[in-house]
Amino acid sequence: MAKSKGARIIITLECTECRTNSDKRSAGVSRYTSTKNRRNTTNRLELKKFCTHCNKHTVHKEIK
């Protein structure tokens, strides 16, 4: 029998300031990968992480 898909999924977090800010340290968009339990956290995650392109801590939002 095949196993059912688990509750944990891999998500991608993207910096919100890299998309809008033109005067940053280097070109590109900062992205992190993480896991979340889709049964406990149904809405999209927002975490403060360090952005290497902006060179500061910024809000990273979950993207599809």
Curated annotation (Swiss-Prot):
A single MF term (Gene Ontology): structural constituent of ribosome
An annotated GO cellular component: ribosome
Entry keywords, A to Z: Ribonucleoprotein, Ribosomal protein
One GO-annotated biological process of the protein: translation
InterPro entries registered for this protein in UniProt: Ribosomal_bL33, Ribosomal_bL33_CS, Ribosomal_bL33_sf, Ribosomal_zn-bd
NCBIfam families linked to this entry: PRK00504.1, PRK00595.1, rpmG_bact
Family: Belongs to the bacterial ribosomal protein bL33 family.
HAMAP family, sorted: Ribosomal_bL33 (MF_00294)
Record-given protein name: Large ribosomal subunit protein bL33
Source organism per UniProt: Nostoc punctiforme (strain ATCC 29133 / PCC 73102)
Gene assigned in the entry: rpmG
